[in-house]
Amino acid sequence: MPHSTAAPATAWTHPPVRVGLVGAGPWARAMHARMLAAGPETTLAGVWARRPEAAAEVAAAYGAPAAASFEELLDTCEAVAFAVPPAVQAALAPRAAAAGRALLLEKPLGTDLETARAVADAVAEHQVISQLVLTKRYHPATRAFLAEAATREVTGARSCYLHGAFLEGDFATAWRLEHGALLDLGPHLLDLLDTAVAPIVSVRATGDPTRWIELTCEHENGAVSQASLSGSVNLPRARTRVELFGPGEELVYDTADIDHEECWPILRREFATAVRTGQGTGIDAAHGLHIQRLLASARP
């Protein structure tokens, strides 16, 4: 898989952040390990996974050690990146926070509101930096869309996130097949609607998360939005689209022409900057808990 290692235009002047990686599955291999090893803002300090042979394989590809235990991984790093199912992340992230490690977290924080709250509470209690891998948020096209949306009066919105990854392949994993598109794709779309329209105050759902689920959201500003989610439909490529409507011209965000490889250098730089300066981005565990509350209220 091609992977952009292009660094942002300004030089990195801090020591690289030593990041330990938890997980050695498809997403750990395809994104986390490559991104963290590319630097210059980060180095891959070690890899730990439930299967030692898988951790060793991922670590060896980047000249990093494979840790024999989670505790050993914590000893080698100053930040931890998670590329594991939500239930595993929710069990381990509070331990990393208690050890004073910064957290690069996947969405959703946990499989339910209780476990997600435990992660967010640990981050707050131990005052560690946290950042959520809401991939699309780190793409320049997304940021341009959100900046323009902030200038608009929005009456209503329609959106979708659709693909067929649950049908077969590496990403048809047990937790995705069990919980479906609501927990896997829902955080991305709810985050975009919550940011582009106005904070979401209520969500109603209909359908089956493992097949197709429809969400109707009410926002603080009185706007109403709808979101269609499915990971079980046959499409030539993933489709993410948000349409904003109001008194002015419609505003459309569509990922059809964006290269997600552009996200990784930005994500890496912003996480490392947050760790080195102690100033988070706002796309953090607290925001993840807000999204998890919306997911919980949308459970059909």
Where are these regions (language model features)?
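C-terminal helix-rich "cap/oligomerization" subdomain common to oxidoreductases
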Residues: 1-13, 72, 79-82, 128, ...
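A short helix->loop->beta-strand "cap" motif at the edges of active sites that frequently abuts
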Residues: 64, 99-101, 126-129, 222-223
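N-terminal Rossmann-like dinucleotide-binding module
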Residues: 1-62
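A contiguous active-site-proximal alpha/beta segment in oxidoreductase catalytic domains
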Residues: 110-168
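Contiguous beta-strand/loop segments that form the cofactor/metal-binding neighborhood of enzyme cores
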Residues: 2, 190-255, 269-277
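Mid-domain beta-loop-alpha active-site segment that forms a flexible
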Residues: 133-140, 168-200, 267, 287
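Hydrophobic residues in well-ordered beta-strands that form the structural core
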Residues: 28, 68, 105-106, 130-132
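Beta-loop-alpha module in the N-terminal Rossmann-like domain of NAD(P)-dependent dehydrogenases
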Residues: 62-120
